[in-house]
Regions:
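Short secondary-structure boundary segments
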Residues: 87-88, 109
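Phosphate-binding/catalytic loops
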Residues: 95-185
């Protein structure tokens, strides 16, 4: 991680399925440009990533080593340059902990939809970390970009559900991460 790395925080409920998958995929895709962590609004603190999510994340080329769930705190939200929640409810909970973070808080799917829109401006800064910062600044006033009609920006919680739900949630996360990573590379 470089000195100018952007701090990204991913948030879900238990911090064992969705947010750790997003964390590890973003970390793999962004490398030293970002310090990516995750936390849960009702975390199963200390637990590893759910066993059903591990092979999906690893097959995508990201490491699951050393992961332990953490409870979301106001300090985490305040210190993050970008908060990526897995549902709109998680985003609301994070912003309630630190209202100052509202303009840098998105759902993962929302940010991918915004930056993936043809109307989103090209990012022009030099480094990947600077392009990530520029992306956050450009995305905040464009929250409805690409939202044609009713938009569901939530990734379903696969916890204690079947492998099909894990795969569906994982694919949504992976595809959104790919859009975000591609936008800054």
């Amino acid at each position: 991680m470089s000195a100018d790395s952007i701090r990204i925080l991913t948030v879900c409920t238990g911090n064992i399925c969705r947010s750790p998958a997003a964390e590890r995929l973003l970390a793999a895709g962004l490398g030293d440009a970002a310090q990516v962590t995750s936390a849960g609004t009702g975390a199963l603190s200390g637990y590893p990533m759910d066993a059903a999510m591990v092979p999906l994340v690893e097959a995508a080329g990201a490491s699951t080593d050393g992961f332990a769930a953490r409870q979301l705190t106001p300090a985490m939200v305040k210190s993050a340059d970008l908060i990526l929640a897995l549902t709109t409810a998680h985003r609301s909970q994070a912003v309630r902990l630190a209202p100052v973070a509202v303009r840098r808080s998105f759902t993962l799917l929302e940010l991918a939809r915004i930056v993936g829109s043809p109307a989103f401006p090209a990012l022009t800064t030099e480094s990947v970390s600077d392009r990530l910062r520029e992306m956050v600044q450009q995305a905040a006033p464009r929250r409805m970009l690409g939202a044609d009609g009713v938009v569901d920006d939530d990734v379903p919680d696969p916890f204690r559900r079947g492998p099909e739900v894990f795969m569906s949630s994982f694919v949504m996360i992976r595809d959104a991460v790919d859009v975000i990573v591609d936008a800054v590379h």
